[in-house]
Each structure stands twice: as C-alpha cells, then as structure tokens.
C-alpha cells in the first residue's frame, strides 16, 4: 500500500510538472528549463522509493558466527521531522518525503520560509492521493522561530 501511495505522488508530480516548475522558478529565480528538469529528478526520487516500499520484507546478512543469522527488517520509526533549505527546495524535500513515506513514517516538514511554494503544492497533491490525516504535516514560518522549536524538541 505504501508503495502505491508514493507512486501516486510521483504520478501527480509528473502530471503537474509544468505548474511545479513555474512555482520553483518563482521561488528560486532559476531558469524555467532548470526547474522543469528538476521535476523529472523529483519524479524519479519518488518512483525509486515507491519501489523500495514494496521490498521491505527483510534481508539476511552473513555472520561469522556458525548456526546464526542476522536479519535486517525495515520498520517505521515514527515521526520524521524535516527542515529543508532554500536551494533546490522541492528536490531536497523529495529526498526526505519519499523515504519517510515509503518506510511508513509520518512526517512534519518545514520548508525554507523564502522558497515554500513547491513544497506547499506537493503537500496539496499528497492530500489528493489520500494519505491518512496526520501522516503528512506542513509547518510554515521563519527558521529562527519554527525551525528552532522543531530542532529543539
């Protein structure tokens, strides 16, 4: 189920890439061409982690101890807090959002106060996908106020 939801976000990003690229350009001042290229990278990040979400059954690791085995199991750790910088705002956010959701974690995201537009829009798209209430949480505000509270909690 997690993989399908994360894949659905990737699809929404692809469907809305022109709008997202324009917002990214408005936010950052980079060229529309560069912002448009970023949307392909962002789509691919979500697709990559969507694929991993379906493969979390565990992995056996060889050990030097006879008659023993070591198994790595990927489990949600709970709530992930994420603060992203102003440069490459949506790309850096995707590096945090996609793995958190793919592993079943809830997230609290605070984008840079000077470049929040694409992150706000992607959160709207994630709501359209239908993540359970409280799974995705967006906090806006100055880093000196909101970021300090989040990182000090």
Q: What does each model-found stretch correspond to?
A:
Residues 48, 58-153:
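Rossmann-like NAD(P) dinucleotide-binding subdomain of oxidoreductase/dehydrogenase enzymes
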Residues 1-56, 67:
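Glycine-rich loop-to-alpha-helix module at the N-terminal edge of alpha/beta enzyme cores
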């Amino acid at each position: 189920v997690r993989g399908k939801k994360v894949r659905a976000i990737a699809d929404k990003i692809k469907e809305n890439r022109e709008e997202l690229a324009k917002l990214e350009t408005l936010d950052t001042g980079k060229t529309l061409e560069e912002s448009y290229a970023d949307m392909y990278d962002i789509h691919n990040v979500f697709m990559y982690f969507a694929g991993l979400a379906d493969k979390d059954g565990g992995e056996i690791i060889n050990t030097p101890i006879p008659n023993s085995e070591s198994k790595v199991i990927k489990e949600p750790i709970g709530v992930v807090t994420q603060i992203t910088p102003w440069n490459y705002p949506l790309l850096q956010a995707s590096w945090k959002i996609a793995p958190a959701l793919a592993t079943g974690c809830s997230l609290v995201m605070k984008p840079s106060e000077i470049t929040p537009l694409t992150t706000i829009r992607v959160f709207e798209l994630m709501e359209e996908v239908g993540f359970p209430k409280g799974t995705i949480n967006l906090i806006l505000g100055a880093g000196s106020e909101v970021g300090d509270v989040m990182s000090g909690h």
